[in-house]
Amino acid sequence: MKKNHFDIIVIGSGPAGEAAAMNAKKKGRSVAVICDLEQVGGSCTHLGTIPSKALRHSVKQVMQFNDNPMFRDLGDARKLSFQQILRHADRVVYEQVKMRSDFYERNQIPIFKGRASFLDKKTIKLIGKHKKLTANHFVIATGSRPYHPPGVDFSHPRVFDSDTILNLSH
């Protein structure tokens, strides 16, 4: 088999791309993944779901701790800066990336960094790189974006979506 030819190439390393790649590999297929971010995991890991949920969970824990009479009797309420809480979310993202990277490495699935562009029905190139890959089949799992309902001003400084909530500074 040629070095840059695979049974299946998965474009995207988020949850759907990861599942497709792992399932194909478990069925004995040669698989490669194209990832347009510096690290695997897609927007779910880096922008939206995981970091925003980690942030929300951390804030809820601090609030519950400070509201719990058992802990209140121990002294003053715990004060954590927003930056400390954001660092926790960053740590969660780091752990997710490491775990997902280990999945790919353990299953011997190569990751190619870059954005894919089809040259024909069996060939893609990595944009900005001199790399072409071929496959018998492709899975396009490029993810989604936050929904912005009409009538909500997302340019307002106090309105955030799951991709921008981590840009808060306080």
Task: Walk through the language-model features, giving the residues of each.
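Beta1/beta-strand and adjacent pyrophosphate-binding region of the FAD-binding site
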Residues: 2-14
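Glycine-rich flavin
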Residues: 3-6, 22-29, 35-170
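N-terminal Rossmann-fold NAD(P) dinucleotide-binding loop
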Residues: 17-18
